[in-house]
Amino acid sequence: MSIHTRRRPYPRLLAVAGIGVATLSLAACSLGIDDETPSSSPSASDAAAPDASGSDDAQALGGTVVLRTHDSFAVPEETLAAFTEATGVTVDVQSSGDAGQLVNTLVLADGDVDADVVFGIDSTFASRAVDAGLLAAHTPADQPASAEQYELPGEAADALTPIDVGDVCVNIDDTWFADRGVRPPETFEDLADPSYADLFVTPGAATSSPGLAFLLATVAEFGENGWSDYWQRLMDNGTTLTSGWSDAYYVDFTAGGGDGDRPIVTSYASSPPFTIDEETGESTTSALLDTCYRQVEFAGVLEGSQNPEAARALVDFMVSPTFQQILPENMYVFPVDDSVALPPEWQQFAELADEPLELDPQTVAENRETWLREWEDVVGG
């Protein structure tokens, strides 16, 4: 059996160290996409350039717009070149750690931010960004109707525009369980069952974005009075913690392409398309959709932008088909525009949960640090 495991970008690690900011001028250089990125990804040239801005006067804008984002931002050069061609605006990308670091940097700057647009604030940190007054109101005129379900509640919807969506879910190595004649797990409770002792690995909640999402999933599932007891049962059942997703998936997970011995891992609903058996054309892994926690990424115009019209045009561009169509195979997330065709392997093996676990962003903002301290007490005990 020949298994092809295609590496995906490292997920967004939570802030644990200093912040390095790298600036890429997309008018002149490549974003350095992974060599294993599929060549079949739709090109920006496949879409009409006028879609790139949402403004009839876009070509007259000109200048530069500074985009502050996270380190996992991976958009082909030609995609943003389409925006530049349509608007005359050059996009200067500045990366700043993960989603948590991104928000922290902007909040600590206290309005003194040399940027125009932010992309990559996720639903976990959105309320903090809105409450800090970081964002100017803007709603794209051509926002897809399907994006409305991902909007933040209340006035926050005017500040941040949903761009992509993904589910963090428990993934299993189907081949491992089939070869041993073992019934695969299906639920959170199964992970704490002695039948699955020493089989689960997850990135830690304090050092990893998917790890935090899994913690939040357990809070949503078991409630504020029950999640810590569940975690105690997980640890008593031999759960292994890693510092990040990449170690959990590529080192410890049996289907991660290494020598791992754990057939259950915290990953993404979009992971199965990247573990396809080249002989059968079938994925050897699956996501347990009843364990999924929904994450939405947003973009917004920053208050104090030096080029607000161009900033608004860039946010508009991010919900256009030109940008939405490159998300699955470049950033491994689902577009919020459900009219965009997904790659064939995504259509077959990637699926968003029908009823994902979610917590109100404000509730997360108010309790995140407390939950993390309590989590560390459990796993460190």
Identify the function of each model-found stretch.
Residues 136-144, 160-161, 189, 276-293, ...:
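Short beta-strand->loop
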Residues 210, 216-290:
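Ligand-binding pocket segment of bilobal, Venus flytrap-like solute-binding proteins
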Residues 195-206, 317-341:
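Periplasmic-binding protein-like
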Residues 113-118, 136-172, 189, 199-205:
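A structural signal for short loop-to-beta-strand junctions that line the ligand-binding cleft
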Residues 123-134, 155-183, 211-221, 296-300:
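Periplasmic solute-binding protein
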Residues 29-33, 46, 51-128, 254-257:
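Early extracytoplasmic/lumenal segment of secretory-pathway proteins
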Residues 24-28:
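C-terminal motif of bacterial Sec signal peptides marking the signal peptidase cleavage site
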Residues 171-176, 295-310, 318, 326-330:
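A bilobed periplasmic-binding-protein/Venus flytrap-type ligand-binding module shared by bacterial periplasmic
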